């Protein structure tokens, strides 16, 4: 995980180190963000450690999440039947890593907040929309073609998929349900 939010990095480190024999290492990225990486205590992260299966690797493998590319990501089907509190934890973790909180500019002078999760995986975004419904929040899915410039040449990128929560009622409900780390805008909303 890479982030500039110290509380998010601390939370990630805390969770990884709950797995027996696991620790983390931190590196400073060129962007100024910090990268935190999971690894076994005695060396680099591998799928085997001390002759036994690495428990973190086993969890990731069990749910079919190992070695997935960004556009192949999805929520495992069994997660949709989790209790509501666990759904909230999952949504919090997803929003901490790839979610955003913005303020819309409005002609009335009011700038209402909205929340957005973005991915190149349509399936993941639709899965998140489905999880939001489990906690009584309606999100709208949209897509947008992206582009980038490489060596002066404009190229077409992947389609970006977004689930957006914009209704004041649903924004309030979602922010009340989530335990977010590292979102300055959430602190601004909650005062």
Please tell me what each predicted stretch does.
Residues 1-191:
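Internal intein/HINT superfamily modules and their associated LAGLIDADG
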């Amino acid at each position: 995980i890479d982030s500039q939010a110290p509380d998010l990095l601390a939370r990630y480190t805390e969770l990884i180190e709950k797995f027996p024999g696991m620790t983390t290492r931190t590196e400073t990225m060129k962007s100024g963000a910090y990268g935190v990486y999971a690894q076994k205590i005695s060396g680099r992260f591998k799928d085997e450690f001390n002759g036994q299966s690495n428990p973190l690797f086993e969890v990731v493998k069990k749910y079919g999440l190992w070695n997935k590319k960004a556009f192949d990501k999805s929520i495992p089907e069994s997660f949709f039947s989790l209790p509501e509190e666990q759904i909230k934890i999952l949504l919090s973790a997803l929003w901490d890593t790839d979610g955003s909180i913005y303020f819309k500019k409005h002609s009335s002078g009011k700038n209402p907040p909205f929340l957005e999760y973005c991915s190149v995986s349509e399936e993941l975004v639709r899965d998140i929309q489905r999880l939001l419904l489990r906690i009584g929040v309606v999100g709208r899915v949209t897509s947008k073609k992206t582009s980038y410039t490489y060596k002066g040449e404009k190229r077409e990128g992947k389609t970006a998929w977004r689930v957006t929560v914009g209704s004041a009622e649903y924004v309030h409900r979602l922010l009340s349900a989530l335990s977010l780390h590292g979102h300055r805008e959430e602190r601004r909303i909650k005062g």
